[in-house]
Design a protein with these regions (language model features):
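Gram-positive cell-envelope targeting signals
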Residues: 1-3, 14
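Cationic, low-complexity basic patches in intrinsically disordered or flexible, solvent-exposed regions
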Residues: 4-6, 20
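Gly/Gly-Pro- and Ser/Thr-rich, intrinsically disordered tail segments characteristic of DNA damage-repair
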Residues: 13-301
């Protein structure tokens, strides 16, 4: 489903969930709903690592067509390679330059300033300064990634009805968990962990999750807050938000582009009006008609 259509379907989604809930003998009020957003970690890169029998969390790998120019965009960068400051959608020449920079620093720590080998494994590199950093370049296989995505979707179907799973992209879904927590006797976090662990055990791919009292909070919990949560032994990060914790944690968070659906252009227009944070936006939305900061200012953006 195109991302811009997700918000349009919220009311339809709610109505379907209520109907499904009645069939199952329960009804979850709209104010008490719980949503889980799940994002498969560096999905394309993880698939390529798994297919090579490698650990997706410790293998340095990029998904890119190396036969094109070095300006080609990497479709994915593995987590261990991101640790060197390489963004998820870097161009190939940026990866090459960063690896050169890292190896220059590593060479200074190598015995005699000479490398005695190379490795694309983060654990081996951490254990031995004698090795130079290298990485695997995997040619994109989009049809294969779609097959993996379908397999993972079918795993989710073991736990929830299709009416309650909403595919956001090839590697990301929203799940309305409201009617299932009581049935399974689990908290929202435990339920998320249960599904993610099943995906990991079945495919070797881990994930990050956000839990919220609405779609937006689940998404933001996953995109922003989970990044600051310690990962478990499987690399899983899960964060939760409700309306109050959102205000407490993210009211003053910057940059605004970290938030769902706020791009650089919109951020720039907001900043031109003296609006820099979500707290500023909220205060503007309740401003009175005679004040400079009021909701009309936001509507004109």
């Amino acid at each position: 489903m195109p991302k811009y259509e997700l918000e349009k379907r919220t009311n339809v989604w709610y109505n379907k969930n209520i109907q499904f809930g009645r069939k199952k003998g329960y009804k979850v009020e709209r104010d008490n709903r719980i949503y889980i957003a799940i994002d498969l970690k560096s999905f394309y890169a993880s698939v390529e690592c798994v297919e090579r029998g490698l650990d997706p969390l410790t293998t340095n790998l990029v998904v890119a067509d190396a036969e094109r120019t070095q300006k080609t965009i990497c479709l994915a960068v593995s987590p261990s390679l991101k640790e060197y400051g390489i963004p998820g959608r870097a161009r190939l020449f940026e990866v090459i330059e960063k690896v050169k920079e890292v190896n220059c620093a590593r060479r200074m720590r190598a015995p005699g300033g000479i490398f005695q080998g190379e490795s694309s494994d983060a654990l081996e590199l951490s254990a031995s300064p004698k090795l130079s950093l290298t990485y695997i370049t995997a040619t994109p296989r989009m049809a294969y990634y779609m097959e993996y995505s379908t397999r993972i979707y079918n795993i989710y179907l073991k736990y929830v009805a299709p009416e309650d799973i909403h595919v956001y992209s090839v590697d990301e879904v929203f799940i309305d968990a409201s009617g299932y927590l009581k049935t399974y006797g689990l908290t929202a976090k435990e339920f998320a962990v249960k599904m993610i662990k099943d995906v990991l055990d079945t495919t070797g791919i881990t994930a990050t999750a956000g839990i919220g009292t609405n779609l937006y909070l689940a998404k933001v919990a996953m995109d922003i807050v989970a990044k600051h949560v310690d990962a478990d032994e499987d690399g899983v990060r899960i964060a939760e938000l409700d309306e109050m914790s959102y205000r407490r944690i993210l009211w003053n968070h910057t940059p605004l582009t970290d938030f769902w659906r706020i791009g650089r252009g919109y951020e720039h227009r907001l900043m031109e009006c003296g609006i820099y944070t979500m707290g500023d936006i909220a205060r503007c939305s309740v401003g009175k008609d005679g004040e400079y900061y009021n909701e009309e200012l936001l509507y004109k953006m």
